[in-house]
Amino acid sequence: MSILRKIKGKVRSLFRRKKTTEPAAAYDIWASSYDRQKDNPIAYLNSLVFNDILDALDLEGKTIVDVGCGTGSNWDKILSKRPYKIIGYDVSSEMLGRLHQKYPQATTFLLHDNALNGSWDLSCDMVVSSLVVGYIKDLPAALAEWNRVLKRGGEIVITDFHPVALQGGGNRSFTHEEKVVYIKNYVHPLHKIKALANKMNWQEIDLIERKVDESIKFFFEEQHVLHVYEKEFGSPILYGWRFRKG
């Protein structure tokens, strides 16, 4: 399949609803090609937002918990900040396998029922979670578990598909063997996340909301679907959030 067709399928798939696959099974399928994707506007924007947030943080000597670490796509950036340790969690054993190919000494755990097994209470300085929140069914339980392992004064960094995009018919998907795989996900409005954060005394430091704009226009131009770009221009597509535990 040509790059053009892949991009075309990816952007169109963002606005269709189909039969969905559970995240663990979907990412087991995606693992073999996940690090090679060049046609994903969400991954592109997420990298920009995640890196912008991390650029403002001092991670030297700190313990970082990465919830939904996947293949470790953010680990080069995190490791460049010289943390003491990264502990990775993911629901997909295949994604963790790919991570260990890149980082053989990595500490990782297969994630079940949101439990951060292997991390003690108040033991970490930061929890990061990139493109994961929308896959979590029981978000209050998950955030409570993050709060359990996080030290007072520790920080939380979340990036994810914007709920407004999902409510508007957007999908989380990828192409495998010329077929689009749609991943089961849940819509968690930002006000709901903020209410949960307030309940745990997480103080908002920064909120970035990225919209369909000129920075991703080329994805639409390359597949000749500028009408989709024009229709969605200005619509929220991804957010990045930084909190500090009080």
Per-region residue spans from a language model:
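A short SAM/SAH-binding and catalytic strip from SAM-dependent methyltransferases
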Residues: M126-L139
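Class I SAM-dependent methyltransferase SAM/SAH-binding core
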Residues: V65-V67, T71-L116
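Conserved class I S-adenosyl-L-methionine
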Residues: S2-D58, S73-K77, M95-R98, V157-V180, K184, K211, ...
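A short glycine-rich, Lys/Arg-flanked "PGG" loop and its adjoining helix->strand segment in the class I
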Residues: P140-R152
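A short acidic, Gly/Pro-enriched loop at the edge of an enzyme's catalytic core
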Residues: G118-V127
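Short alpha-helix
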Residues: N185-L207
